[in-house]
Amino acid sequence: MRILIAEDETIIRLDLREMLEKAGFDVCAEAKDGEEAVTLARTLEPDLALLDVKMPKLDGIEAARRILEERPIPIVMVTAYGEAELVSRAVEAGVFGYLVKPFRESDLLPAIATARARHEELAALREEADSLTEALGQWRSASWLEPGHTREWTLTWRGTKLL
């Protein structure tokens, strides 16, 4: 798994890199500010990003929003700020995790695993919703073309909830 780190404090970036590489992850890039994080995410297409909240040029939450607009990946915020307003903004931006510094490797690795799992689950739900929308559109088209024509559909539990 290729991970992008965005953190304005050099020592924390180095600590994050060390923890991640020790756990077997590939740190594909390091950014010192939010703008650089967005650019690197666009060009390198990492599998996950760790972003600090308060960074120069562009804060981590806005950087997360921009990254997710272009390419949905799991994002975990790593920050010294745990205020409810910041957490709320991060959730609204679409991040999958929020870690308050200082943290240990035993905190970081589960946060990454959870973010990946939630991202994969959301992707599967979106794919199923798209498939159901397409099937429903085909069914409606067929029923309009052939009056009285019906089709039998078998839906999963998730599918019934989406309808």
Identify what each model region corresponds to.
Residues 52, 79:
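Active-site residues of response regulator receiver
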Residues 85, 103-113:
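C-terminal output helix
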Residues 123, 127-163:
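C-terminal output/effector regions of signal-responsive regulators
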